[in-house]
Amino acid sequence: MKTAHEIRPGNVIMLDGSPWVVQKTETTRSGRNAAIVKLKLKHVLLDSGTEQTFKGEDKMDVIVLERLDCTYSYFADPMYVFMDADYNQYDVEADNLGDAAAYIIDGMEETCQVTFYEGKAISVELPTHIVREVIYTEPSARGDTSGKVMKPATITGGGTVTVADFVKVGDKIEIDTRTGEFKKRA
């Protein structure tokens, strides 16, 4: 049993007797109240999705499923194909990747963990930190140095990340895949 606050994207939880893949988590805190955790979920067996809200201390069953270390191979619409060390290929639907799809690129060297439920690949968990190149961002605003200045940047793979003002096109940056936050220049 894990608390709702400990749940991460890629986890599979049991709700009302059915397995659900967590695609996104969002935690909000208020001054007097406990943390509220909003989970974006996709049913493992059906193609339905939902959003559920829990208190941070709510307990839920996390299913321990088979996981394999795999590398990204190619995209065959609407499937992402991953390959293990024995050259077995596994198809994962694009919908099952959630926000992780923005970080998956051709030639990706990072190893991902593919999760299986009843023999079917249902989700992919990326490494905690990945390095991607900035392909577009606005130039820095001259003289705007008060506080922590951030701006949007498009990275290889098409995802958008909020980066520090000093980041330029062509820079390689480190991103935390759990939160989608810029960490540092690589």
Curated annotation (Swiss-Prot):
It is found in: Cytoplasm. Belongs to the elongation factor P family. InterPro entries: Elong-fact-P_C, NA-bd_OB-fold, Rib_uL2_dom2, Transl_elong_fac_P/YeiP, Transl_elong_KOW-like, Transl_elong_P/YeiP_cen, Transl_elongation_fac_P, Translation_prot_SH3-like_sf. This is Elongation factor P. GO terms for molecular function: translation elongation factor activity. Keywords: Cytoplasm, Elongation factor, Protein biosynthesis. Involved in peptide bond synthesis. Stimulates efficient translation and peptide-bond synthesis on native or reconstituted 70S ribosomes in vitro. Probably functions indirectly by altering the affinity of the ribosome for aminoacyl-tRNA, thus increasing their reactivity as acceptors for peptidyl transferase. SUPFAM superfamilies: Nucleic acid-binding proteins, Translation proteins SH3-like domain. Its main location: cytoplasm. GO terms for cellular component: cytoplasm. The gene is efp. It comes from the Bacteria. The lineage of its organism: Bacteria, Pseudomonadati, Pseudomonadota, Gammaproteobacteria, Alteromonadales. One of its GO terms (biological process) is peptide biosynthetic process. It comes from Shewanella denitrificans (strain OS217 / ATCC BAA-1090 / DSM 15013). SMART domains: EFP, Elong-fact-P_C. Pathway: Protein biosynthesis; polypeptide chain elongation.
